[in-house]
Structure formats: structure tokens, C-alpha cells
Amino acid sequence: MSSPRSNKPKIVNGPGGYILQDVPHLIDYLPDLPTYPNPLQDNPAYSVVKQYFVHADDSVPEKVVVHKDGPRGVHFRRAGPRQKVYFESDEVHACIVTCGGLCPGLNTVIREVVSSLSYMYGVKRILGIDGGYRGFYAKNTIPLNSKVVNDIHKRGGTIIGTSRGGHDTNKIVDSIQDRGINQVYIIGGDGTQRGASVIFEEIRRRRLKVAVVGIPKTIDNDIPVIDKSFGFDTAVEEAQRAINAAHVEAESNENGIGFVKLMGRYSGYIAMYATLASRDVDCCLIPESPFYLEGEGGLFEFIERRLKDHGHMVIVLAEGAGQDLMCKSMESTPMDASGNKLLKDVGLWLSQSIKDHFKKNKMVMNLKYIDPTYMIRAVPSNASDNVYCTLLAQSAVHGAMAGYTGYTSGLVNGRQTYIPFYRITETQNNVVITDRMWARLLSSTNQPSFLGPKDTSEEKKELPETPLLDDGAVDIPPVTKEVTK
């Protein structure tokens, strides 16, 4: 028996600086697999669609704005149905697992994976893995069909349960092999996708005909490459309720301060977009933008000035902001089961610090602290996220049926793509505070940047020079393997 091909990333180079960061395929290590006509050819719902099947050479650029003399840059394989599939309908035994924290849209993704497998490809055997990764070997499975998932998109949470941690690669793959599962749909954040990548590598090592597909989920919107993560729009919309309440409280009291803490462990996207959407916020604090409390240009001085000028203000704080002010080192901070640092409650600490400052200076102030952290992630997804979840799920199913594996289904520049796991797990998506979007926020709130010239210059130095233009930093990983096409 021949050994599997190299596990290095699949890179295809083309003219004009074209780079395709391709995803693995079952035939990479099982070259003799038969193909079958796609059942969608006989599906009346798609008979009127012209060019419904995606061309094998279609790809989507990672960056759409380029210099006229610059390279074409990195591309990803376009998602969608192929004319040939590598699984027969009766052969498919699929499973779905959700891991990590809750996020609006989880049930919608589950529903659409089941519906796509059932209605598009005639698949009958679909299982839900109960309670995250450990459910593969520690719990019973949940049979899923179109009747079971019919209206679950109207509910928050996940009907198959979730958990953090519990990743035991050998036990998980043993369970997949023993149950005869050949399509695995894994819904979760960056840690979950890293686990999915390890599962895929073990499945490839065992040379199993099993497609492993990731669907990226994080309410913080901190997964790289993709335009946004599902549930983010809903979270921003739901955060408006808390901000509106804070604004009402602040306006109704002398020197009133409405203080809202939102999710955002390392990335401040929810706080930033909720602030921009609200237009009632006077100060937004995020992990990426350091700030200080005392002295000229500090937060306390800004609060005093804003209260003097307007008589009230609203502060929005991401949960990961200001952690350095609470403790000198994060090294001793405990971890949760997924390996994430358990952050201290900076919201309570900062609100108390503001109260103490005003009391010390004998100034009247009324602060109302609102923490909707878990409320914004436990709600059903809104209309926009429901549509997005549908597209993600359908694209994931099309890719698995076409034999692709070891990839994440994601939206890049408005197009559905297949992204190799290593691009999703290699870094984290953060707000770039020298970017136009952060400048728009500062213009909206009229808050200081809390950065000196030195901080700004250092931030800009961190951004790599590249002929590709974008609002944020661009990072094209080096080509590690060349495949001539």
C-alpha cells in the first residue's frame, strides 16, 4: 500500500502572481475512488438554474483591491456543487457537532446541513453528536432528520448541546470509524477548528474515506480570512438594547454614565460595530486599543470633560479591554477547558474605579452598569444571519459530497469559498486601530485615541508592506509547496 501524499499545504502558482491555497481532497490519499453524477442534475428545484455547477478552476481572491502593477495574490477554491460527487446518497452517514460557546445561528446551521443533505442529496442517515467533542465517545447520538430540525432556527442555543474541551483525537476518530461515519461537520471557533484539523490529519493517516468539514463560529468575529462569522450581526443588533437602556439611564440622571460591557475577549469587533450602529456612545474601549486612567489625556479626564459639556455619557467596554490595568501579568491567569484565558471582570473593576475617582474629587456622578454579555449570544439569529448560515451550510455539504476535506466553509469578499484549516487557525482577526474603521469610530464618539505618536508609529510598523490594499493588515503566508497545474 502506497503512503499518503505530503501533509504540506496544497499551493498552486499561476501567472501574474496568482496563488491558489487549495484544500485537501479524498483522492489525495485514496486515488482510486469512483465518482458519481451529482443528484442535483435531476432535482427540479435546480433545473432552471444556468451554470449551477461550479467550474473546477473557479477561485475567489482573498483581496479584491490591488495595484495595477501588483500581483493577483492569494485565492481560495470557490464553493458550490460539482458535476461529479464522491459519495452515493445511500452510502453517506453524516454527523454534526457543535463546540465552544453559544452563538446566534447554531441551530440554523444544523437545520440547513440536515436539509441540504436530505433534500439535495437524498441522504437518510444523519446524527447529532451530543455535547461537543466528548460526545463522540461519552454520550449517545441524536438522530436528525428534516422533521426534527424543522423549526429549530427560531430558537437560540444548539439542540445537540455543546461543551468546551473534551478533545481526544484517537477516541473521536475511533468513534467515527466504529459508527461508519463518513462525513463530519464541525461547527465551532478557532480552537474547535484546530481540533477539526487534528481529526482530519488522523483520518488521513488512517486512510479513511471520511470528509471533515469545518463551519466557523465565533460571536467575537475574530476568525481570520472570512468576511465575518455567523451570529455577529445578531449580536451587534442585540447589543443595541443594552446601549439604548444605558443611554436612557444616563440622560435621566445628573452627570449620568451608562456603562455597558460587551463580549470581546481579544477582539473588539462587537463593541466597535455596536458603537457605530448606536451613535449614542461617547467612548468605546477595546482590547486592541490601550488606554490609561489617570493624568492628562487619560480616561478619567475625558469622562470629566464629557460630563461637563453634555451632562451625561455612555461607555461601551469589550470584556478584554484594560486587562493590563488590573493585573501586571496574564501569565498566572487560569484557563478554561478550551485553553482560553479566564479574564477578570474589567467591567466591574473599571466602573468602581470611575466611582472612586469621582468620590475622591467630590464630584457628583451616577453610574449604571449593564452587562448583557450572555444575553446577546443566547438569542435566535436575525434574518441576515439566517441567510448567511444557510449559505455556509449548503456550501459545506456541497464540498463534502464533492470529496473535499480538511477545510472550512467561509465567505470571502462576498463569495462562498473553501479555506484550508491552517489559514483559519494560524492567527486571529483583530481590530486594527490604525485602520479607517477605527478612525470612523473615533469620529463618531469624539473620544481621544488614548495613543501617543509613538504608539501610532509602532502600530503602523507592525503592518507589512504589500502591493495589495485593504482596510487592515495583509498577511500572505510563504509558499511551502508548489504544484504545477
Curated annotation (Swiss-Prot):
InterPro entries (alphabetical) = ATP_PFK, PFKA, Phosphofructokinase_dom, PKF_sf, PyroP-dep_PFK_TP0108
Question: How is the activity of this chain controlled?
Answer: Allosterically activated by AMP.
Which residues does the record give as ATP binding sites?
101, 164-165, 189-192
The domain of life for this entry's organism is: Eukaryota
| Reactions catalysed according to its record | beta-D-fructose 6-phosphate + ATP = beta-D-fructose 1,6-bisphosphate + ADP + H(+)
Q: Which residues are noted in the entry as Mg(2+)-binding?
A: 190
Primary location class: cytoplasm
> What EC number(s) are associated with this protein in UniProt?
2.7.1.11
Q: Which GO terms describe its molecular function?
A: 6-phosphofructokinase activity; ATP binding; metal ion binding
This protein's name: ATP-dependent 6-phosphofructokinase 7
Source species of the chain: Arabidopsis thaliana (Mouse-ear cress)
Name the gene behind this protein.
PFK7
